[in-house]
């Protein structure tokens, strides 16, 4: 690390750079901003980070982020338990929930099949999804997975496993190939949910 920074500041910049989307300049800007803030404010941020890391885990049913063994969505009696929307990541659950269109439940795979990265079906929450479909009265599984090469591979794999047991659909996309659900606006996501179709 450059001698421009004192050692504690250099460590802070280095740690901030580990965050996704944060390059050297952004890390420096954030570090300098934090140092200008009152100590109580910085301590509150540090405590919130530690508390979230210690208390937030994964729902035992759908694998979405949760501070409880079963998340609020899975516990909610108003949710349609016969429809499961399968997503790659909790960020996708958050994006879809913002549309206020989907009233069913979710299942978070925890990633996508990517042989280049050493991620196969066994590293994802695929088997718990299959068990869940078998054990519940699931009438439809909606595959809401990003339209990337890895996303298509995952969609086809999961779809083929589930088609013998339930209706499998995928959302229609107003996104280009390689686009991410997380960055789509609410209207695009809402239309994608409405325009879902059966998986061929």
Curated annotation (Swiss-Prot):
Cystines in this chain: none
GO molecular function: DNA binding; zinc ion binding
Gene3D superfamilies: 3.40.1360.10, 6.10.250.240, RecR Domain 1
Gene Ontology BP terms: DNA recombination; DNA repair
ZnF bounds (C4-type): 59-74
Position of the signal peptide: none
UniProt-listed SUPFAM superfamilies: Recombination protein RecR
Keywords per UniProt: DNA damage, DNA recombination, DNA repair, Metal-binding, Zinc, Zinc-finger
Family assignment from sequence similarity: Belongs to the RecR family.
HAMAP family: RecR
Entries under NCBIfam families matching the protein: recR (TIGR00615)
Reported function: May play a role in DNA repair. It seems to be involved in an RecBC-independent recombinational process of DNA repair. It may act with RecF and RecO.
Stated name of the protein: Recombination protein RecR
Species the sequence originates in: Acaryochloris marina (strain MBIC 11017)
Gene from which this protein is expressed: recR
